[in-house]
Amino acid sequence: NIKKKLKDMMYDTSVTIVIVSPHIKESKWIDWEIEYCLKNITRKNRTSHTNGIVGVIMKVNGGYDWFKYTSTKSDGCSVSNYYDSKVYDIINNNRYNQNPKVYSCNQCKCVSALTGSYIAFVEEDEFLSNPKKYIDNAYDKSENDADGYDLTKQR
């Protein structure tokens, strides 16, 4: 049974790396895996905690513009934007969910790419150049039991 094997593999983990690809929503399992990793699961008197999650954006045709684009706010701040319809709601609902919000810029109210969302997005090349940075960021969020984030744990 695939679901049982996945549960066994994920139960003792603390960080989940989600590869954000153009075909992510075609998978029958990814949104379920994310939901499972966000829950506290009890087995034999032991409870697993919410995993930290990092979304690694797959490089396609040499770039990331299939999913990510940059815009400039009226105050001059450059911010990353994403085509939200390309990923599952459980991912979108755990983005920009820091509470209370800590703004990188108080004028335009933009947030940090790493801390403004429970599920941070990072480009594949950036992730591969320093995976520890992004895994540690997700791990720290999970170790604090997602404190400071309004989590959506259901698909």
Show the residue positions of the predicted features.
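Conserved BB-loop
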Residues: 1-6, 26
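Inter-motif core of Ras-like GTPase G domains
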Residues: 12-18
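Conserved beta-strand segments of the P-loop GTPase G domain that flank and frequently precede/overlap
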Residues: 18-21, 55-57
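Conserved TIR/SEFIR loop-to-helix hotspot centered on a Trp-containing motif
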Residues: 23-40
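Arginine/glycine-rich "motif VI" loop of SF2 helicases in the C-terminal RecA-like domain
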Residues: 39-50
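Short beta-alpha junction loops
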Residues: 49-69
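C-terminal interaction surface of TIR/SEFIR-family domains
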Residues: 62-155
